[in-house]
Amino acid sequence: MHCAEAGKALIKFNHCEKYIYSFSVPQCCPLCQQDLGSRKLEDAPVSIANPFTNGHQEKCSFLLRPTQGTFLREYDGRSDLHVGITNTNGVVYNYSAHGVQRDGEGWEESISIPLLQPNMYGMMEQWDKYLEDFSTSGAWLPHRYEDNHHNCYSYALTFINCVLMAEGRQQLDKGEFTEKYVVPRTRLASKFITLYRAIREHGFYVTDCPQQQAQPPEGGGLC
């Protein structure tokens, strides 16, 4: 697993009336070869946050990763994704044809969606017990697994709705959860992957002043 890649940010700077992306600021502009040593404040490089995180460092979160390979290297935008829920120690509970798995590794390059607000101490204290009790119910035995209708996403969303119900909150269907919480982050991830691979191949990537993209809310828990 390429943990260093998962944490690597991209750099964007302006020159030649273009936006230039790279892993670091070069000494000279790759387009005109002019020295980049002195720039105006508004032309200062900015860091583009990496949308991927080590899922084992995330508490009480919903995680996504490719079923095979990693986002930055192998993912083609069409391959299957696998999802799971972390406990307070970063162990990833996920459902497959083998039943509920409790992974201590393998999710080092994931998209993470926090499920609790930072001040929800009561729920956090009970989280691990809720997750373990939920996972040992008969609904998630290996023979009940079905690729399209009773899968890893069903497992994760059903648990999320159990937590919402315990909190007296309205439950979410798959479409609502996906559109509100998953799609904004996967769109950002897709753009980051495109930039990352182009920079890895050519050393830099150039665009014409793109429109600023909306960011998903930071740190806001679902529950």
Swiss-Prot record:
Q: Which Pfam families match?
A: DUF4796_C, DUF4796_N
InterPro entries in the record? MKRN2OS-like (IPR032016), MKRN2OS-like_C (IPR053921), MKRN2OS-like_N (IPR053922)
| Membrane-crossing residue ranges in chain numbering | none
**Do you know which PANTHER family this protein is assigned to?**
MKRN2 OPPOSITE STRAND PROTEIN
What's the protein here called?
MKRN2 opposite strand protein
Biological source species: Homo sapiens (Human)
Q: What is the lineage of its organism?
A: Eukaryota, Metazoa, Chordata, Craniata, Vertebrata
